Amino acid sequence: MGVIDARQLKTRGLDAQALTSLPRLSAQNLSLDPRLHDINLSVNAGQILGIIGPNGAGKSTLLHCLTGLLPHTGRSHLDDTDLTALSPRERARCMGLLPQQTDSVWPLSVHDVVSLGRLPWGDNDTTAIANAMRATGIETLAPARIDRLSGGERARVWLARVLAGQPRILIADEPTASLDLYYQQVVMDCLRTYANAGHIVIMAIHDLALAAHYCDQLLLLHNGVSQASGTPAEVLTESLLSQVFGVPVHVDLTAQPPVVSARFHRPVA
């Protein structure tokens, strides 16, 4: 994807001047021993930051530290606002979390699930709820029970719940896990659109090809330690990925869509 220039920003509804004036999320020395060690990151509004790495690298831990769900050391700021000093309600208004596990133990309607996104605000803003359902294409599912939907439909419902809260920062933990190719694209397009509107999106993601296509910045973790950060072109190198994942890796970011995959060898008979 490379470095974003003014021409690219205009195609996303932003120009270079707008990008510099939009909020920036930064974190310094986030740690949670023994799972996370001195993580630094920075991401502008209008961008998607992808957190990548092997299983157990600390991706979900980092997201939960950013949202305040796990105790940790270090600081995080949205411009001059110290997020670690906010009350739980203030933080919930600022940041919305789309967890990896999104099953409901109650037979709620789709509309009721999406309405839960307004809890931090203490209201039932019908416009925000309707806009979230429209953005995810679930308007016709409003009266349906969440437990009777397909996996792809449920994924869009839970994403709509987060969007209904209108957070400045949307944090998603493996938003495409267990989704087929069609719904992967639907969900990722929704997240891209939300970022384009001037919000910050941070996601943990296993699919490196999707990360290369949709993310503006990447942070590569291994054993709770940052290995690299930067644009997809800077982070997704064959040598670095082979070292971190322990297998030979093939990378072609010029392909459409980008290709990032293990090099498989034929077993010896």
Please report, for each region that a protein language model flagged, where it lies by residue.
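Catalytic Walker B motif of ABC-type/P-loop ATPase nucleotide-binding domains
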Residues: 170-174
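Conserved ABC ATPase signature
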Residues: 145-149, 153
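The feature captures the beta-strand-to-loop junction immediately N-terminal to the Walker
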Residues: 52-54
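Conserved ABC ATPase "signature" region
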Residues: 126-142
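ABC ATPase nucleotide-binding domains
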Residues: 242-269
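Conserved ABC transporter NBD signature motif
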Residues: 72-82, 91
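Helix-to-loop junction immediately C-terminal to a conserved catalytic motif
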Residues: 67
